[in-house]
Swiss-Prot record:
Protein's UniProt name: tRNA-cytidine(32) 2-sulfurtransferase
Residue positions of motif PP-loop motif: 54-59
UniProt pathway annotation: tRNA modification
Keyword Iron-sulfur belongs to the record: yes
Chief subcellular location: cytoplasm
Species of the source: Bordetella parapertussis (strain 12822 / ATCC BAA-587 / NCTC 13253)
GO biological process, one term: tRNA thio-modification
Subcellular location: Cytoplasm
Annotated function: Catalyzes the ATP-dependent 2-thiolation of cytidine in position 32 of tRNA, to form 2-thiocytidine (s(2)C32). The sulfur atoms are provided by the cysteine/cysteine desulfurase (IscS) system.
Disulfide-bonded cysteines: none
Record's keyword terms, sorted: 4Fe-4S, ATP-binding, Cytoplasm, Iron, Iron-sulfur, Magnesium, Metal-binding, Nucleotide-binding, RNA-binding, Transferase, tRNA processing, tRNA-binding
Top EC class of this enzyme: transferase
Named cofactor requirement(s): Mg(2+); [4Fe-4S] cluster
Keyword Iron-sulfur part of the UniProt annotation: yes
Length: 320
């Protein structure tokens, strides 16, 4: 008689725990991605979603999660994976095609030598990211048109969105971030970021669980002096010392109150006048309370004892 040992019985307790935690993480990522897609109407029936696959952990996770969601979505949509081979030295051209064929996913590899352009134009020691991203974006828009893709899905996550916000805040003087969904400047393409609600730490753990064949970026990954890395370290330090702070900042990006900022294009401060009608959602904590007719009348502040009058003057200074 042959004894058959099931795969589950063959696992060690540590392996079983890792598998359990990995499956729990996968469910959480699917839930957060589904929520972002629904909140911003990222994917609709009949869409052809072009998933930009770089070979990094984020884009691998994005493709993996979207393929999983595609199987149980209440409507049909297509997925095609696209990789831009920028001819970086040491880039292994066989890894992604082999991975995608094994998954049975339609894919397209676009080969463009942007590496030579960037290294020729940008002086040594300077950051290459800006030019590289512009070149890459233009190529991907063209490929999307050629493939008939209706949505371009990028693997940016919560930390990328936060980092971009702080970069614009610190170095650009703008309260500007990285939106979960946008239309390209030429008005022809819709870009979506389904991982907008997912923290990078979860994607790191997911890549380890799934054992994605990660391809390092030798061009920008080696530029350790990037401001984005500095901002990333700041966010990590916050998460370590002040749990919840970075999430509060992230949540604030979707809870903007234009009347309490200073942008005259967002709110009409020039035409702002009292209406005599209380704002139900307003802050009335500092509104003056009308005095009772039988206890005080006009000029009550001047009739008050000296100490009390001084206190009122002090309050006016404090809250001015």
């Amino acid at each position: 008689m042959t004894l058959t040992v099931s795969p589950t019985a063959a696992r060690t307790p540590a392996e079983e725990k890792a598998r359990f935690e990995g499956n729990k993480l996968a469910k959480r990522l699917a839930r957060e991605t589904t929520r972002a897609i629904a909140d911003y109407n990222m994917i609709e029936a009949g869409d052809k979603v072009m998933v930009c696959l770089s070979g990094g952990k984020d884009s691998y996770a994005l493709l993996d999660i979207l393929l999983s969601l595609q199987k149980r979505a209440p409507f049909a949509f297509e997925i095609i994976a696209v990789n831009l081979d920028q001819k970086q030295p040491g880039f292994p051209p066989e890894i992604l095609p082999g991975y995608l064929r094994a998954l049975g996913v339609p894919f397209h590899i676009e080969t463009q030598d942007t590496y030579s352009i960037v290294t020729r134009v940008i002086p040594e020691g300077k950051t290459m990211c800006s030019l590289c991203s512009r070149l890459r974006r233009g190529i991907l828009y063209r490929v999307a048109s050629e493939l008939g893709a209706t949505k371009i899905a990028l693997g940016h996550h919560r930390d990328d969105i936060l980092g971009t916000f702080f970069l614009n805040l610190f170095y650009g003087g703008k309260a500007k971030g990285m939106p979960p969904k946008l239309v390209s400047d030429d008005g022809r393409h819709t870009v979506i970021r389904p991982l907008a609600y997912v923290p990078e730490s979860d994607l790191i753990a997911y890549a380890q669980f799934k054992q994605f064949p990660i391809i390092p970026c030798n061009l920008c990954g080696s530029q350790e002096n990037l401001k984005r890395k500095e901002v990333g370290r700041m966010i990590q330090e916050w998460d370590r010392k002040h749990p919840g702070r970075s999430w509060n900042v992230f949540n604030a990006l979707s809870r903007v109150v234009p009347s309490h900022l200073m942008d005259r294009d967002l709110f009409d401060f020039v035409g702002l006048k009292p209406t005599g009608v209380a704002d139900a959602g307003g802050d009335t904590a500092f509104d003056q309370i009308d005095p009772e007719p039988d206890t005080a009348g006009p000029g009550c502040a001047s009739d008050a004892p000296a100490g009390q009058a001084d206190g009122m003057a002090e309050q006016r200074v404090v809250f001015r």
